[in-house]
Swiss-Prot record:
Keywords assigned: Cytoplasm, Elongation factor, GTP-binding, Nucleotide-binding, Protein biosynthesis
Domain tr-type G residue range list: 8-283
HAMAP family for the chain: EF_G_EF_2_B
Database matches in PROSITE patterns: G_TR_1, G_TR_2
Domain of life per record: Bacteria
Residues engaged in binding GTP: 17-24, 81-85, 135-138
Transport found in the keyword field: no
Coarse class of the protein's main subcellular location: cytoplasm
Keyword Nucleotide-binding: yes
Location of the protein in the cell: Cytoplasm
Entry protein name: Elongation factor G
Organism: Rhodopseudomonas palustris (strain TIE-1)
Any single Gene Ontology cellular-component annotation: cytoplasm
Family in the record: Belongs to the TRAFAC class translation factor GTPase superfamily. Classic translation factor GTPase family. EF-G/EF-2 subfamily.
């Protein structure tokens, strides 16, 4: 069956926002008005179509990015719903990677919030073209113009209003479309399905003219002919204006801002028009680059005639179909039943069932084309970030980067049956989410779960208990400390065992020095003249690496260290890779002691938004948690306090803050950097763990 929609008619986009800005509600309305959803799901009733895991429906936050296909004005929309909670930034990062464009939703009452900044920065990183939707215009305190100023102040971006609100709070009636210079007013009785063009209210006409002029001036800057015509007194027509706004979105010259209230069903259809008019098709964004099997850079254009390449960006466990792998097809055509190669893992796979997902309804399809986002059932080897491609034209597309977890908990199954279920469940959860790690504590034998924050791990434990029916005891959250050396150390070590039987002999000389922060572990061999034969070097590395996972201060992983093998000795008969491994292990441990290893702790960037009455208490409390106040700011009538606080002092903070502010303050926190722990903290940790 040939392609139904031309690739230039595709819009692969996501909706990004701070938690509670109304992102899921906006997505719901899009599905409702595009005819894909027969009933509007409300988040606060726990019934939203996109939020399809039980955990999401209860918490009213979106955790997993479900991909949905819908249609508007003859264009095919592939919508990826992204989570807005900071513990799930990995999901956002992953979906931004496969999107061509995004709608950034703001709460008009709050403006740009901490998580908006985070997702905006991630959007900048992947160069995602964006439009902005100022939502919740019906809310008390909604202020469209403050949102515009916030985008300048907090995101450092250039916003251009292409709509203005008609009224606000309870009197929010509709919007002024500055491109067409028309008012668009919604009929409250029709659930927002009916709306009509009207003349702009007289009292808003001057304001509309002023903002239209600003919009035109920003647009004509992108085109010399349009600029010349404008300077001669000729305004661009509607088609030219739309073309220039589209150009601005694609180049990031400015960001068009629209407004509405998804909850009150106002402003959603013009937002859909803007998605179609201004966001890119797969042909408008740069072709994806990758490397072939010889390591050469290759480009895959968004074209059905190109060799097949697709990227797995999400893996989910579906109760009906089993494992589902969400993929973005970048080039070529994918047919059900064909063989592909997972070039990242060098494994072959066969494509079985192919599904088009609509939130949690699914439609079986037999073929998919460049630009499509599809769900593949039953892939055995695929993990998030893997490339699948045509075996005759192997390619590995750009890798995704995943952050290191900063918090961990121990989990102990209550019975042998639970132990078996736990193993299967954790393997699936780790495959679905690369920021969730599972390891075994070698000394205690306990299973350790590592994640990005308390909520992240809470939800994983919840899934284990509900979905996989694992009954287990959960330990208190622990901080993921690290260790690093602070000065250069030189060591010589000889391992000798020559009593009876085959002997063991190996001598190594190391120079061990601190690497720059974030530089990781680096090994270099400067052996000349065969002082350590080549075949024993892997043994040397293995010995060092066995110590990296548990350092000498309190048994935590060693980071940012450079080890240089400068000399050594071997014995023709008694030396072996194992002997060099043993020697290197002991030498490296000695070097860590000599190099004055210290304990590093994760420092979190904390932002507290509180009514002014509680500012003193909040600051006093943060100081008592070893927090360093970075600054204060007013946002509306609330005080915003920014601080750097060690993670170990932030456990249970949510309840403390709630009682301190009578539930009126809230906070967000994300990992910022590792820093050396003070001596008293280090001693306390050593006593507990060493």
């Amino acid at each position: 069956m040939p392609r139904v929609h031309a690739i230039e008619d595709y819009r692969n986009f996501g909706i990004m926002a701070h938690i509670d800005a109304g992102k899921t509600t906006t997505t719901e309305r899009i599905l409702f008005y595009t005819g894909k959803s027969h009933k509007i799901g409300e988040v606060h009733e726990g019934a939203a179509t996109m939020d399809w895991m039980t955990q999401e429906q209860e918490r009213g936050i979106t955790i997993t990015s479900a991909a949905t296909t819908a249609f508007w004005n003859g264009k095919r929309l592939n919508i990826i719903d992204t989570p807005g909670h900071v513990d799930f930034t990995i999901e956002v990062e992953r979906s931004l990677r496969v999107l061509d464009g995004a709608v950034c939703v703001l709460d008009s009452n709050q403006g740009v919030e901490p998580q908006t900044e985070t997702v905006w920065r991630q959007g900048d990183k992947y160069k995602v073209p964006r439009i902005v939707f100022a939502n919740k215009m019906d809310k008390t305190g909604a202020d469209f113009f403050k949102c515009l100023q916030d985008i300048v102040d907090r995101l450092g971006a250039k916003p251009v209003a292409i709509q203005l609100p008609i009224g606000s709070e309870n009197n929010f009636k509709g919007v002024i479309d500055l491109v067409r210079m028309k008012a668009v007013v919604w009929n409250d009785e029709s659930l927002g399905a009916k709306f009509e063009d009207a003349e702009i209210p007289a009292e808003l006409l001057d304001q509309a003219k002023e903002y239209r002029e600003k919009m035109i001036e920003a647009a004509v800057e992108l085109d010399d002919d349009a600029m010349s015509a404008y300077l001669e007194g000729n305004e661009p027509d509607e088609a030219t204006l739309k073309r220039l706004i589209r150009k601005a979105v694609l180049t990031g010259a400015f960001y068009p801002v629209l407004c509405g209230s998804a909850f009150k069903n106002k402003g959603v259809q013009p937002l859909l028009d803007a998605v179609v008019d201004y966001l890119p098709s797969p042909l408008d964004v740069p072709a994806i680059k990758g490397t072939d099997d010889k390591g050469n850079e290759v480009v895959r254009k968004a074209d059905d005639k190109e060799p097949l390449s697709l990227l797995a960006f999400k893996i989910m466990d579906d109760p009906f179909v089993g494992t589902i792998t969400f993929c973005r097809i970048y080039s070529g055509v994918l047919l059900s039943g064909t063989g592909v190669v997972n070039s990242t893992r060098e494994k072959k796979e066969r494509i079985g069932r192919m599904l088009l997902m609509h939130a949690n309804n699914r439609e079986d399809i037999k073929e998919a084309y460049a630009g499509d986002i599809v769900a593949l059932a039953g892939l055995k080897e695929a993990r998030t970030g893997d490339t699948l491609c045509d075996p005759a034209n192997p390619v590995i597309l750009e890798k995704m980067e995943f952050p290191e977890p900063v918090i961990e908990i121990a989990i102990e199954p209550k019975s042998k049956a639970d132990q078996e279920k736990l193993g299967v469940a954790l393997a699936k959860l780790a495959a679905e989410d690369p920021s969730f790690r599972v390891s075994t504590d070698l000394e205690s034998g306990q299973t350790i779960l590592k994640g990005m924050g308390e909520l992240h791990l809470d939800i994983k434990v919840d899934i284990l208990k509900r979905t996989y029916k694992v009954d287990a005891n959960i330990g208190a959250p622990q901080v993921a400390f690290r260790e690093r050396i602070t000065k250069k150390a030189e060591v010589d070590y000889t391992h000798k065992k020559q009593t009876g039987g085959t002997g063991q002999f190996a001598a190594v000389s190391f120079v061990v020095e601190p690497n720059e922060p974030g530089g990781g572990y680096v090994f270099e061999s400067k052996i000349v003249g065969g002082a350590v034969p080549k075949e024993y070097i892997p043994g040397v590395e293995k010995g060092i690496e066995s110590v990296l996972s548990s350092g000498v201060v309190a048994g935590f992983p060693v980071v940012d260290v450079k080890v240089t093998l400068v000399d050594g000795k071997y014995h023709d008969v008694d030396s072996s890779a194992l002997a060099f491994e043993i020697a290197s292990r002991a030498a490296f441990r000695e070097a860590l002691q000599k190099g004055k290893s210290v304990l590093l702790e994760p420092i979190m960037k904390v932002e507290v938004v509180t009514p002014e009455d509680y500012t003193g208490s909040v600051i006093g409390d943060l100081n008592s948690r070893r927090g360093q106040i970075q600054g204060q700011d007013m946002r509306g009538n609330a005080n915003v306090i920014n601080a750097m606080v060690p993670l170990m002092n932030m456990f249970g903070y949510v309840n403390n803050l709630r009682s301190m502010s009578q539930g009126r303050a809230n906070f967000t926190m994300q990992f910022d950097h590792y820093a050396e722990a003070p001596a008293n903290v280090s001693a306390e940790v050593q006593k507990k763990f060493a």
